[in-house]
Amino acid sequence: MIKRSAVVLMAVILTGCGNKTLEEVGNAPAMSPVGSGLRYNQAPQLASYPKQTKAVSNGYSLWNDSQAALFKDSRAINVGDLLTVNISIADKAKFKNDTSRSRKNSTSLTWSTVINLFGITPPDSSGDMSTDSNSSSDGKGSVDRSETLTLMVAAVVTSILENGNLLISGSQEVRVNHEVRILNVAGIVRPQDVDAKNTISYEKIAEARISYGGKGRLTEVQQPPVGQQVVDMFSPF
């Protein structure tokens, strides 16, 4: 009987949890796909990298056509081209809110009824009624945070939108001892915002998705155990 009750309880927990919630247990929150904030009927699809065309050799020339880019713009404009993303975030926010509300209400009612019917006067019927109500609330909240992140990462042009804007995506992993630091960047850029050094600053990236985290021994220790996360998910306190 106890075993059956435990099975039923576990089934109820799993049903109420849902597949999406279970996938998030033990993992960092997933970032939304690039382009999901745009008003498109469908999200922009990533295109496959184009094949590089064969260089045509000319027997009467000392130079190869593949290197004929003396006056060519070296900025990323095609699918598969690379560009450098400069990330320099120094955000600081400080908020302080105080709210106070007070309300007072008072109601008084007095009545007196005397009826003379066929010469008969009943006893006097009169009364008083009053109500008083008071309510008040006070609330305080404050936020004080600062974040600094300075990195550079190479990204690849993965797609070109209909209006000519570029969809880029880049990733970088660095392993130090048993900890892997992961940097991901993705977003939509305008070709004219890419400077002559083929570099673009992060604040010029629309729908920017910048993630800097890691995985390894230190990250595992900093996260609460999976069982505790499941319990916290259903705990009402």
Curated annotation (Swiss-Prot):
User: Which molecular-function annotation in GO is an example for this chain?
Assistant: cytoskeletal motor activity
**Quick one: signal sequence residues?**
1-16
Q: Where is the composition biased (Low complexity)?
A: 124-140
In this chain, the stretch annotated as Disordered covers: 122-143
Output the InterPro entries linked to this UniProt entry: Flag_Lring
Q: What is its main location?
A: membrane
- UniProt topology in membrane: Lipid-anchor
Covalently lipidated residues, kind S-diacylglycerol cysteine: 17
Q: Can the keyword Lyase be found in this entry's annotation?
A: no
Q: Which chain positions have N-palmitoyl cysteine-type lipid attachment?
A: 17
The protein's matches in Pfam families, at most eight in alphabetical order, are given as: FlgH
Q: Which PANTHER family does the protein's record reference?
A: FLAGELLAR L-RING PROTEIN (PTHR34933:SF1)
What does the UniProt function comment say about this protein? Assembles around the rod to form the L-ring and probably protects the motor/basal body from shearing forces during rotation.
How is the quaternary structure described? Answer: The basal body constitutes a major portion of the flagellar organelle and consists of four rings (L,P,S, and M) mounted on a central rod.
* Annotated HAMAP family: FlgH
Name this protein carries in UniProt: Flagellar L-ring protein
Its source organism is: Allorhizobium ampelinum (strain ATCC BAA-846 / DSM 112012 / S4) (Agrobacterium vitis (strain S4))
Recorded name of the encoding gene: flgH
